[in-house]
A protein has these predicted regions:
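Metzincin-family zinc-dependent endopeptidase catalytic domain
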Residues: 1-101, 113
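The catalytic-center signature of Zn2+-dependent metalloproteases
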Residues: 85-149
């Protein structure tokens, strides 16, 4: 629950967005491992990664099954709000979207890939796709998560 302000160097003026990869890298450098299992960063700024117009979040994905390593992810809540699109606020929907995106990115930190099942790990390229997916893992993804414990 530590706060870390964004830096000017992480901002892309041409895109009017923050570089999610730079922010996540700095967040992870500033984390003291202690007894942490995973790190979830939450930012209220518009973010991008690579050539994508925007992302709801990004994650460090383990290449090998290393349970001792600390992995993290970052989600942006900016585009999850209806107000971003000039619509009336809906706090219940905002909370549901935030939960789904947090679970999705945290799933990646446990090595889960995008899933075609009815699953929170289904890729979302729009808010409608986020709204349409459930807030839980399918049986296959749930088994993979449980194998880490």
């Amino acid at each position: 629950q530590n706060s870390l302000p964004v830096k000017e160097s992480e901002y892309n003026h041409e895109r009017d967005q923050y570089n999610a990869s730079l922010i996540l890298r700095r967040v992870m450098k500033n984390i003291q491992k202690n007894d942490l299992l995973r790190v979830l960063g939450i930012i209220d700024e518009d973010i991008f990664s690579g050539n994508l117009n925007f992302v709801f979040g990004i994650a460090q994905i383990p290449k090998f099954r290393n349970l001792d390593a600390l992995f993290g992810c970052l989600i942006s809540i900016t585009r999850l709000r209806r107000e971003f699109y000039g619509r009336q606020a809906n706090i219940k929907l905002f909370k549901e979207r935030t939960l789904k995106e947090a679970m999705h990115e945290l799933g990646h930190t446990f090595g889960l890939k995008h899933c075609q099942n009815v699953c929170v790990m289904r890729f979302s390229n729009s808010l409608q796709e986020t709204d349409d997916k459930p807030s839980n893992f399918c049986k296959e993804c749930q088994k993979q998560i449980e194998s880490h414990f």
